[in-house]
Amino acid sequence: PLIVEIMAHSSTQDTVSSESVQATAGANIPPADSQARVSAFMKRIQDSICQRLEELDSEHQFLEDSWERPEGGGGRSRVVKQGNLLEQGGVNFSEIWGDRLPPSILAQRPEAAGHRFYATGTSMVLHPRNPYIPTVHLNYRYFEAGPVWWFGGGIDLTPYYPFEEDAAHFHRTLKQTCDAHHSDYYPTFKKWCDEYFYLKHRQETRGVGGIFFDYQDGRGQLYRGPAEEGPAAQYSNQIGELPTRSWEDIFAFVQDCGDAFLPSYVPIIERRRDTEYGDRQRDFQLYRRGRYVEFNLVYDRGTIFGLQTNGRTESILMSLPPLVRWEYCFEPEPDTHESKLYDVFLKPQEWADWIESSA
């Protein structure tokens, strides 16, 4: 649920100074048609993703559940179940508006007071059936209240079996997209993604990461997260504040990120979907899916906030896989594909720089 995502992230964001916030007022204002344009984009990427996935598995179509928010807004939830390609997947669009801003946002952006707010976004989680195809997660969102606005989101990949060429292709596609807008976007947002999708109690990343960003309004430093001593913050501090980028600049970047999903992921599907697997691979996939559940229920701010504030439970938990298993003190056998996942793929790597001959 979008308002859950916005409020949860705003309640933990504490690194944007009041000076930079005040500088937003009166400058870099969104265009008059900003909301309509972002809404159209969010719907378009939902449509294009669903259409391409249905082409890849023509026997199983997404079922749409449209809903309306009495206070203003609504959305389209699309879910596929028990497909040949996707065991379960969801691609959701939502947009909401209203007069009452969440206190957590007003505390961070006081100049938003007195303005109506608007928020929209598209989110997606795909759980493939074949263990050799990675799970993938995408989320892009936009918030606006008068002179205050920002974009956030990202995309990350969670493989169950280690294929360097897949991780490299995914990251290179994202890096190429980011580099077309600014050379510091990818290194910052890649590090931010590794930081966010980390299971502290397991001391491992959720997968091979991707990119993650929030509070991007074209001003100040790129990193706006809570880990002030982490690699993303260190890199962001090193490059300093970037020149002001316009609303159009940031929107163009987010559009390109959304459009990069299919070329980043579909080639992996096509490369792995016909690979045969047995009980061993299926059992390991279900075991590793447990990490996805653990992250969402223990660390994901949107999930936690939604459950604590009586949000729509079915929507909040829709990202969870349909089947999962846990095993006490599981250890992969040495020198296996499963152990390689732990040794290499669940630690931050510079996948965009991977060279095949080094594998």
Predicted segments with their positions:
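Short, Lys/Arg-enriched N-terminal segments with co-localized hydrophobic residues
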Residues: 1-6
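TerminUS-proximal long segments
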Residues: 18-21, 26, 309-359
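Gly/Pro-rich turn-and-neighbor structural signature
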Residues: 30-109, 239-278, 282-292
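Aromatic/basic-lined ligand-recognition segments
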Residues: 71-97, 194-235, 290-297, 305
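Internal mixed beta-strand/loop scaffold within catalytic domains of large alpha/beta enzymes
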Residues: 77-153
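Short conserved micro-motifs at the rims of enzyme active sites and ligand-binding pockets
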Residues: 104-106, 222-224, 304-310, 328
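Long, contiguous internal "core" modules enriched in hydrophobic/ aromatic residues
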Residues: 149-275
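C-terminal, helix-dominated tail/subdomain
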Residues: 281-325
